[in-house]
């Protein structure tokens, strides 16, 4: 797997792929409903992360919020000025075993 010039996949691409997958299984669901489900899914992810909940999808991975320590020697890349960064929270994703194996090319 090469990481130079990787193609970007958009939400519309994902909607198209899911729609095709559904059609291949002899089901019918309009793309606008697929988009609604995807939007609702991400809203729930954001809402749960903002509530400091851990979201686990077995074999795929875990989403959580972690606290990142501040530091004194951060540098603004535009001005070169040194600034103080306070402690803050960041969204974090920890991949699950199956995802790691697929990305690394390991047969499971």
UniProtKB/Swiss-Prot annotation:
Keywords: DNA condensation, DNA-binding. GO terms for biological process: chromosome condensation. Changing residue 19 to A: In strain: A44S and NY13-87. One of its GO terms (molecular function) is DNA binding. Belongs to the bacterial histone-like protein family. The keyword DNA-binding applies. It holds the Pfam family Bac_DNA_binding. Disulfide bonds: none annotated. SMART domains: BHL. Changing residue 65 to L: In strain: 25015. It comes from Borreliella burgdorferi (strain ATCC 35210 / DSM 4680 / CIP 102532 / B31). Histone-like DNA-binding protein which is capable of wrapping DNA to stabilize it, and thus to prevent its denaturation under extreme environmental conditions. One of its GO terms (cellular component) is cytosol. This is DNA-binding protein HU. It comes from the Bacteria.
């Amino acid at each position: 797997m090469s990481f130079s010039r990787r193609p970007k996949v958009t939400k519309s691409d994902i909607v198209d792929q899911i729609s095709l997958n559904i059609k291949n299984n002899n089901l019918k669901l309009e793309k606008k409903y697929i988009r609604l489900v995807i939007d609702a899914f991400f809203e729930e992810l954001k809402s749960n992360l903002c509530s400091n909940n851990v979201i686990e999808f077995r074999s795929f991975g875990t989403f959580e919020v972690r606290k990142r320590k501040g530091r004194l020697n951060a540098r603004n890349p535009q001005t070169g000025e040194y600034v103080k960064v306070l402690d803050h929270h960041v969204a974090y994703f920890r991949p699950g075993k199956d995802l790691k194996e697929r990305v690394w090319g390991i047969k499971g």
